[in-house]
């Protein structure tokens, strides 16, 4: 496949990974339901499904890297399609988190009789937003600045500087995750403490999960940059990871204002 390709099709070799990923997701879902209810063998099926799903993700992305780096299949048209796909994926995640913000706003603006007609509900301890949550916010935003630094370094052809910037990104992300764990350990409410606890842990936990995923993306990009896979002409994988990381940064700002600060008043 050459750069002068005139059609927009993303032609790849036949792959077993879509069907294996579907089977892994099915086993994970069924195993999760069996484990929660609980049925015998649920934990085993859940574990096997997760292992199978993670293995499929690893080998599938490995094949994508081979197609782009070694085989030259990712032409400019294909790269454009991958960028569109990344944007649509991030939009779907925005909708997911929007549901949690909606639930929190709906519950706080119109508290029901069951929780005493006040927000936060009477008797529920709340987290001080000006302690760990406030400290964690600039830490995560700084990691976003480091990603931007890495992007400019790649565009300038400065490979070592890009690696250093990605190391800084990952380090700050790990610090953020550690503080998030401390926050959960010290937080007064539990996830079963009325709608307040449920929306608090769903929103912050889902965001924390995204931070972990983004950290893994940044680690992979750092390794690929060190190996010389990323150039100023071809770095779609890094761009997708950077967009994802900036999305996580923006969500953190909304979380701090609406969940930690305003929602905890």
UniProtKB/Swiss-Prot annotation:
**Chief site of localization:** mitochondrion
**Known EC number(s)?**
7.1.1.9
Q: Does the keyword Membrane apply?
A: yes
Q: Which Pfam families match?
A: COX3
Membrane-crossing ranges are 16-36, 41-61, 84-104, 137-157, 162-182, 200-220, 245-265
Reaction equations catalysed = 4 Fe(II)-[cytochrome c] + O2 + 8 H(+)(in) = 4 Fe(III)-[cytochrome c] + 2 H2O + 4 H(+)(out)
Keywords assigned: Membrane, Mitochondrion, Mitochondrion inner membrane, Translocase, Transmembrane, Transmembrane helix
Q: Name one GO molecular function term.
A: cytochrome-c oxidase activity
Coiled-coil ranges per UniProt: none
Membrane topology listed for this record: Multi-pass membrane protein
Where is it localised? Mitochondrion inner membrane
Q: Name one GO cellular component term.
A: mitochondrial inner membrane
Q: What is a biological process (GO) this protein takes part in?
A: mitochondrial electron transport, cytochrome c to oxygen
Its annotated function is as follows:
Component of the cytochrome c oxidase, the last enzyme in the mitochondrial electron transport chain which drives oxidative phosphorylation. The respiratory chain contains 3 multisubunit complexes succinate dehydrogenase (complex II, CII), ubiquinol-cytochrome c oxidoreductase (cytochrome b-c1 complex, complex III, CIII) and cytochrome c oxidase (complex IV, CIV), that cooperate to transfer electrons derived from NADH and succinate to molecular oxygen, creating an electrochemical gradient over the inner membrane that drives transmembrane transport and the ATP synthase.
Quaternary structure and interacting proteins, as annotated = Component of the cytochrome c oxidase (complex IV, CIV), a multisubunit enzyme composed of a catalytic core of 3 subunits and several supernumerary subunits. The complex exists as a monomer or a dimer and forms supercomplexes (SCs) in the inner mitochondrial membrane with ubiquinol-cytochrome c oxidoreductase (cytochrome b-c1 complex, complex III, CIII).
Instruction: Family membership, please give it.
Output: Belongs to the cytochrome c oxidase subunit 3 family.
Q: What is this protein called?
A: Cytochrome c oxidase subunit 3
């Amino acid at each position: 496949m050459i750069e002068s390709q005139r059609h927009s099709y993303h032609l790849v070799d036949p792959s077993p990974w879509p069907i294996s990923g579907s089977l892994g997701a099915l086993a994970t879902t069924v195993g999760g339901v069996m484990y929660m209810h609980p049925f015998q063998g649920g934990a085993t099926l859940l574990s096997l499904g997760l292992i199978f799903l993670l293995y499929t993700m690893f080998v599938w992305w490995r094949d994508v890297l081979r197609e782009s780096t070694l085989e030259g299949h990712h032409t400019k048209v294909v790269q454009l399609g991958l960028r569109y796909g990344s944007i649509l994926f991030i939009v779907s995640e925005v909708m997911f988190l929007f549901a949690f913000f909606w639930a929190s706003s709906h519950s706080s603006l119109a508290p029901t009789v069951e929780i005493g007609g006040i927000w936060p509900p009477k008797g529920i301890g709340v987290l001080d937003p000006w302690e760990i949550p406030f400290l964690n916010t600039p830490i995560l935003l700084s990691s976003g600045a480091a990603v931007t630094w890495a992007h400019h370094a790649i565009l300038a052809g400065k490979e070592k500087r890009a690696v250093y910037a990605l190391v800084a990104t990952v380090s700050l992300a790990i610090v953020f995750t550690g503080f998030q764990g401390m926050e959960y350990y010290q937080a007064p409410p539990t996830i079963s403490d009325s709608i307040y606890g449920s929306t608090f842990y769903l929103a912050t936990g889902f965001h924390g999960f995204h931070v972990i995923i983004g950290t893994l993306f940044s680690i992979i990009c750092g390794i690929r940059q060190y190996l010389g896979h990323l150039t100023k002409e071809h770095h779609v994988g890094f761009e997708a990871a950077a967009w994802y990381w900036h999305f996580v940064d923006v969500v953190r700002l909304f979380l701090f204002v609406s969940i930690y600060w305003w929602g905890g008043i």
